[in-house]
A protein has these predicted regions:
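Cytoplasmic juxtamembrane regions at transmembrane-helix boundaries
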Residues: 9, 78-100, 159, 163, ...
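Membrane-water interface at the C-terminal end of transmembrane alpha helices
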Residues: 137-157
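Individual transmembrane alpha-helices with interfacial aromatic-anchor signatures
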Residues: 96-100, 124-142
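Interfacial loop at the N-terminal end of multi-pass membrane proteins
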Residues: 5-10, 30-63, 84-86, 123-124
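Transmembrane alpha-helical segments of integral membrane proteins
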Residues: 111-122
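Actinobacteria-biased recognition of intrinsically disordered, low-complexity terminal regions
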Residues: 1-16, 153-191
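Core segments of alpha-helical transmembrane spans in multipass integral membrane proteins
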Residues: 22, 29, 48-80, 103, ...
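N-terminal signal-anchor transmembrane alpha helix
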Residues: 17-35
Length: 191
């Protein structure tokens, strides 16, 4: 793995950001479905609660809808930061949101690592296996991606010519061609 504090290039930041934002948006969508009263994939609200949280917690709209809003805001923050959308202040706020996402995922991954050892969890319960196979690995991987994104500066990358939300990275050759064209236009207008 690379150093998590090394900033990402623009193209990789967009890929990482899209992946993390999609995970968070998908999580928000699943919680919105649960807020309707559906307990998929479990048979009951209690079974769902134990599979997801290893505790009996009410899966009611009062609990789930604020969580949906938080996850949606987190997804938007990561997407805005990674795709360099908006003005400088918007991007700074989005970077802070991305750092918060990284911190939250790191915290959940740490708790998951403890639960993998069997501390505070029944190793025969569905939660243990979901945590081992799905929850903790996802938090480690996406937390790493969010940490790398949070380390990526708000300023536009020097590899782009426009400085704002590039469609793709500009190659050195393309930049040289653009400079020559601008010079020719300047000569034409000036002379």
């Amino acid at each position: 793995m690379s150093n998590p504090l090394v900033p990402l290039r623009a193209s990789r930041a967009r890929r990482f950001g899209s992946a993390v934002a999609a995970l968070l948006a998908g999580d928000a969508l699943v919680h919105a479905v649960w807020a309707t009263g559906l307990t998929w994939p479990a048979d009951s609200a209690r079974g769902l609660s134990y599979a997801v949280l290893n505790a009996d917690v009410p899966f009611t709209p009062k609990v789930l809808l604020p969580l949906c809003a938080l996850l949606g805001t987190a997804a938007a923050s990561v997407y805005v930061h990674s795709h360099r959308v908006g003005g400088r202040r918007v991007r700074q706020a989005a970077r802070l949101g991305t750092a918060a996402v990284a911190g939250g995922l790191a915290l959940r991954a740490s708790a998951g690592a403890v639960w993998i050892t069997g501390v505070g969890v029944d190793v025969d319960a569905p939660f243990y296996w979901l945590n081992l196979v799905l929850y903790t690995p996802a938090c480690v991987g996406f937390g790493y991606a969010a940490m790398r994104l949070a380390a990526t500066p708000v300023e536009p990358s020097p590899e782009t010519t426009t400085g704002e939300a590039p469609a793709r990275e500009v190659t050195a050759r393309e930049a040289a061609v653009a400079r020559r064209r601008r010079a020719r236009i300047g000569e034409t207008l000036g002379g």
